[in-house]
C-alpha cells in the first residue's frame, strides 16, 4: 500500500489479465514462472511471470478484469494454471 499526500492509503496497481489473454501472452512470450500463493483471507491467487517482461501478471476474474481472481481451493488454482500454461504435468515447490 502507498500513502497519498492526503494521508489516505491506496492499493498499489496490479496488472491483471483474463485467462484467454494471459494464455496468448504465455504462448507468445514464454513462461518464466507461475506462482500460486495464499493470502490472509485463505484465498489462493495465481500469478505468472513472462520471460520477456519482468512484471508479474495476475489471473483476473471474468466480470471484473482488473481484480485478481481468488480461488477457494488449491486444486482449482492448479487447474487454472494448467490451462494458462497449456501443460498437463506440474511440479510443485512448497515454501
List the predicted regions and their residue ranges:
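A short, charged, amphipathic alpha-helix used as a generic interaction element across diverse proteins
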Residues: 70-85
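Short N-terminal "domain-start" leader segments
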Residues: 1-54
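Short N-terminal micro-motifs specific to bacterial/archaeal maturation
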Residues: 13, 67-68
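Short aromatic-glycine-(Arg/Gly/Cys) micro-motifs in beta-strand/loop hairpins
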Residues: 37-66, 84-87, 95
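Generic low-complexity, intrinsically disordered sequence content enriched
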Residues: 26-29, 63, 78
